[in-house]
Amino acid sequence: MEQQPSVPRSCTNVARETPMNLNIQSTTGTRYELSVPPDETVDGLKRRISQRLKVPKDRLTLLHRETRLSSGKLQDLGISDGSRLTLLPSVEAGLMSQMSRPEQSVMQALESLTETQVNDFLSGRSPLTLALRVGDHMMFVQLQLAAQQSGSSHLQHRHVITRGAETSASPQYRTLHTSTSAVSHLASCTPGPTPPTTLSPTSSTHCNGPHSSPLTTSVFRSHGEGVAVSPCAEQAPCSTRGTEGTSSSPSSRSRKPGAIIESFVNHAPGVFSGTFSGTLHPQCQDSAGRPRRDIGTILQILNDLLSATRHYQGMPPSLTTLRCHTQCASQARNAKATSPQSTSPQQTTHPVGHCQTQTRTYKPSGDRLRQTENRATRCKVERLQLLMHQKRLRRKARRDSRAPYHWMPTRKSSRTSSNSSTSSGEGSLEIDFEDSLWKPDVKAELNSEFVVA
């Protein structure tokens, strides 16, 4: 009995890894082929179709032999090479289409990204721009990551944050400042329970922790066309002034996953930029501590930033800076008035450090913020009312200029007061005979023979 030659395992593996070609046919008449791996799932197939058609994945329905595909692997559902699938795009009407949530808009924007865009963004090769629509508002968010080689003595990036329970450094993300000469930026020191802040008119100064690790930085910009974003080129060691603590314990360096907004600048109506720092969640990291190449990592960064805005109710940097300078000047005058003889450096630098810390922790209450928003809304309404009133006056003047008779603007209004029966003669017409109702522009010359007595 002859033995049949055995097929090598490599050949079987290649045969198993051969992609499947699926025929996708929509109800609108569109037909195309799609190549997928043999172990592809229904969710992955919907994601591929949504990327190709630019349609949200939730609005796609797939049918195979009149069976709706909801979850599971394609092979387990009897789908093989050459199978035909029917695509049913779901259509919403009425008020349901307006009830889209912000997180659904974010997920739809992230699911439309290709794997190449996600990999290039997370590796720092190219920026990522997302167009998000929340209700009637359109928001553009641009993120930029920049990796740094570890092992150097000087860290050119600004933040080092470790995991909550570990001592090894974890991947970071951080927004860069918008470098403009007219805007003051806030800089922070990472280690220490009460980090001091310094004010700089053109650039921001950051300090670094003792651990060196690969860092990433990101840029957050909302509707930021025309705003130049660049990293800060100035580096300075961290130092505290006055009676602030200069040493930090190892437990204070550890931070929980999340983001903290450090500064926020409003450049123009609808154009914002700021600085936030944070650490990634352990679920978004691989075994080596690097960010996972997945849209979940981008979604985690956006969620951390949106969560940080709820806790950040700070004033604009210009007002905060002005408030800080005023308080510092008043404290300096009080210190000079109480002790004019003693002018030691410690006494002069203490109010500055106190003012900087107070600026960092200053947060107005929610009632003050609501009052400011209500005042701005009230001003807008009054402005619109004024414009509408001026428009009505112009329309009336235009209508009066085209009229055949020009009525005097100073005439008194005539009113009639009559009873139910006007034919009885009880009604009276109140007319002011001192001013005539109509005065011609040209005075007519009447002779005596034309006047009828």
From Swiss-Prot:
UniProt cross-references to PANTHER family, sorted A to Z: MIDNOLIN
Keywords, in A-Z order: Cytoplasm, Nucleus
Phylogenetic classification of the source organism: Eukaryota, Metazoa, Chordata, Craniata, Vertebrata
PROSITE patterns: UBIQUITIN_2
Pfam name, any one: ubiquitin
Every Ubiquitin-like domain range: 20-94
Biased composition annotated in UniProt, kind: Polar residues: 206-219
SMART domains, A to Z: UBQ
Protein name as it appears in the record: Midnolin-A
Function, as annotated: Facilitates ubiquitin-independent proteasomal degradation of polycomb protein CBX4. Plays a role in inhibiting the activity of glucokinase GCK and both glucose-induced and basal insulin secretion.
Cellular component terms (Gene Ontology): cytosol; nucleolus; nucleus
Basic and acidic residues bias spans: 365-376
CDD domains: Ubl_midnolin
InterPro entries membership: Midnolin (IPR039336), Ubiquitin-like_dom (IPR000626), Ubiquitin-like_domsf (IPR029071)
